[in-house]
Curated annotation (Swiss-Prot):
Active site positions: C328
Gene Ontology terms for molecular function: 2 iron, 2 sulfur cluster binding; cysteine desulfurase activity; metal ion binding; pyridoxal phosphate binding
SUPFAM superfamilies: PLP-dependent transferases (SSF53383)
Cofactor(s), names only, from the UniProt record: pyridoxal 5'-phosphate
Originating species: Buchnera aphidicola subsp. Schizaphis graminum (strain Sg)
Binding site for pyridoxal 5'-phosphate: A75, T76, N155, Q183, S203, A204, H205, T243
Taxonomic classification: Bacteria, Pseudomonadati, Pseudomonadota, Gammaproteobacteria, Enterobacterales
Protein name (Swiss-Prot/TrEMBL): Cysteine desulfurase IscS
Length: 404
């Protein structure tokens, strides 16, 4: 058993050995290293061919046409391209966008940027269970609404949104629907042929592929048109300029191929380990589940341990690689904006820990994690004056604290 135990798979995943080995064949003079845009010789033709193969593997996993895949540097760029691209191209049609308060920062910051240049954005507040209220969505649609952007699986809580019915609502109002599927692709079955989704973002490094490569699904029928964010060369059907990184795309294609083969076994494996973890810690006093075992993805478990700062617990659990939220915001001392949007009070949001498990997590590692959490919680609470006051029956909410 490795030490520390890696339980931050929602932040990134290790590259599968088979993926890494295959990527090595597309880097050196002995392999296929050509520029796929060089169509006058064999090196370019070979590079273009393997990219087409990768596109096919990606489309097979998500149920799309391979021609609907646009390569990007990752999900952050894909989210920006989808949101800004639709907004700028269709500005004459309308300037209103709908998203939610619990989206990834790459979506929220893109929307805030659009607000600064004249767009109007509605940020929906999910229900306390994290699910978007479909009636609330309908009420906020107006004649100027051009785009709805909702993530499939939340990166902090693992909550799964009902993108099937959201897509139907958007289609009935002739509104573009963008889905950030970074945490769901390869973990939950997706078939875009059965959904009215117009754009979908995803990344390779979340499903055992390389970092620095991702994609945006852009529907062809009915055709979705958007403005490019980068220009020069007309790559990716004019939507994303730049020489394609062949080795990364090959790695992405291979990781998606493996995900398609392993998705059912992975789902069972992750669900069992997540349930083992929760069953092992749920009887700790003042522990709160911020995820939903029925409406949540199998790889994420978000838990609050009252009267203990999440950062303190992370430091105490040196043998575990865990986080206090999204990898993009975990360095912030502010409580999770996602948990606050769900109505969770600051004290519990501050005490939250995200455990995220993966393909290589073992039952032995989960058993060790349960023991470590119990031990650290007991030790930290023994040092906590707040815990002592709580156990003495003091109503901490009635105390007026001096913040001077």
């Amino acid at each position: 058993m490795k030490n520390p135990i890696y339980l931050d798979y929602a932040a990134t995943t290790p590259v599968e050995f088979k993926v890494a080995k295959k990527m090595m064949n597309y880097l050196t003079i002995d392999g296929i290293f050509g520029n796929p845009a060089s169509r006058s010789h064999k090196f370019g033709w070979e590079a273009e061919e393997v990219i087409d193969i990768a596109r096919n593997e990606i489309s097979e996993l998500i149920g799309s046409d391979s021609r609907e895949i646009v390569f990007t540097s990752g999900a952050t760029e894909a989210n920006n391209l989808a949101i800004k691209g639709i907004a700028f191209f269709h500005r004459k049609k309308g300037n209103h966008i709908i998203t939610s308060k619990t989206e990834h920062k790459s979506v929220l910051d893109a929307c805030r940027y659009l607000e600064s240049v004249g767009f109007s954005v509605t940020y929906l507040t999910p229900k306390n269970n994290g699910i978007i209220d479909l009636n609330d969505l309908k009420k906020n649609i107006n004649k100027n609404t051009i785009l709805v952007s909702i993530m499939h699986v939340n990166n902090e809580t693992g909550i799964i949104q009902d993108i099937t019915n959201i897509s139907k609502i958007c289609r009935s109002h002739d509104i573009f629907f963008h889905v950030d599927a970074t945490q769901s692709v390869g973990k939950i079955a997706i078939n875009l042929k059965n959904l009215f989704v117009d754009l979908m973002s995803f990344s390779a490094h979340k499903i055992y592929g390389p970092k620095g490569i991702g994609g945006l699904y852009v529907r062809r029928k009915p055709r979705v048109r958007l403005s490019a964010l980068s220009h020069g060369g007309g790559h990716e059907r004019g939507m994303r300029a730049g020489t394609l990184p062949v080795h990364q795309i090959v790695g992405m294609g291979e990781s998606f191929k493996l995900a398609r083969k392993k998705i059912n076994d992975d789902f069972i494996h992750l669900t069992n380990l997540r349930n083992d973890l929760w069953n092992g810690i749920k009887n700790i006093e003042e522990v709160y589940l911020n995820s939903d075992l029925k409406q949540g993805a199998p790889h994420i478990l978000n838990v609050s341990f009252n009267y203990i700062e999440g950062e303190s617990l992370i430091m105490a659990l040196k043998d575990l690689a865990i986080s206090s939220g999204s990898a993009c915001t975990s360095s912030s001392l502010e409580p999770s904006y996602v948990l606050r949007a769900l109505g969770i009070k600051d004290e519990l949001a501050h005490s939250s820990i995200r455990f995220s498990i993966g393909r290589f997590t073992t039952k032995e590692e989960i058993q060790h994690t349960v023991k470590s959490v119990h031990k650290s919680i007991h030790r930290l609470r023994a040092l906590s004056p707040l815990w002592e006051m709580f156990k003495s029956g003091v109503d901490l909410n009635s105390i007026e604290w001096d913040h001077t």
